[in-house]
Amino acid sequence: MKNLYKWPAAQSLYPNQGKKSYAGKRFRYRLRSWLHHSKIKQFEQFVTQNPQLIPLLNARPNYSYPVAHRFLDKRFSAKQRLQKITDNLLFLPQKLAHLPPLWEQAVNFGEIIADFELWLNINEHQPMEGFWALELRHRPTNQLVYLLTFGKLDEALLIAVIQGPNFEGSKELVKQLTKSCHGLRPAYLMVETMKALTAVLGYQSLLGIPQKYQNKSAGCKVSAM
C-alpha cells in the first residue's frame, strides 16, 4: 500500500534487464540487509513516525539502501550512518516546509548565466552520494550539465560529490559555460552556488569530503538524460 513503508525487496532495486542478470547485486543487497537487520528495523520505525517520507521512499527503493551500505562518507559506522540518514531526510523538507516536497516539484532558481539554469532537486542518480542536489542545466535542451550532491553533517552542510558531463558535445558546452563565467570553471561555480545556498538555509559552514572517502558511484559522470 502506498501509505505504508516496508524495507524494499532486492528485486525492486535490481530487476534483470533483458538478458542482463543482476543476481550478484541482489545477493549482496540481501546479505547487507541481513547484516544490518537491527538498523533496518530502527529505520522502519523512523519512517512510520515520519509518514510524509513514505511517498519518496516507496517510489525510490534505492533511497533506503544506504542504511545497509554507505552514505555520504565511507568512514561512518553503521550507527553514525543511520543517524545521518534520518537527519538528512528531514532537514531540507523542514527548511522548505512552505514549498511542495522536492520529490514532487524541484525548485527552479532560473538562469544564473545565459542559457544555464540552476535547480534544487532530489538526487536522481545515486542516493548514497546524498539525497539532495544542485543541478546546472542547459536551458535550450534541458540537459543536465553539472551535478552537486550534498547533505547535512551536524550543524554544517556537506558537499558529497561534484559530477561533470559525459555526453556528446559536452566538452564544447563546458567551454561555452566557462567562457560565460569569465574563466571560472563550472565545478567552482557549483561550489560558490552551494556556499550561497548554505547561507540562505541558515548554516554557517560548508564542508567537503576527502576524495578517498567519497561514495562516488562507478559511473559518476553525468550522462545524457
Curated annotation (Swiss-Prot):
InterPro entries: DUF535. GO terms for biological process: DNA damage response. Keywords: Cell membrane, Membrane. GO terms for cellular component: plasma membrane. It is found in: Cell membrane. Pfam families: DUF535. The keyword Membrane applies. To H.influenzae HI_1119. This is Membrane protein LapB. The gene is lapB.
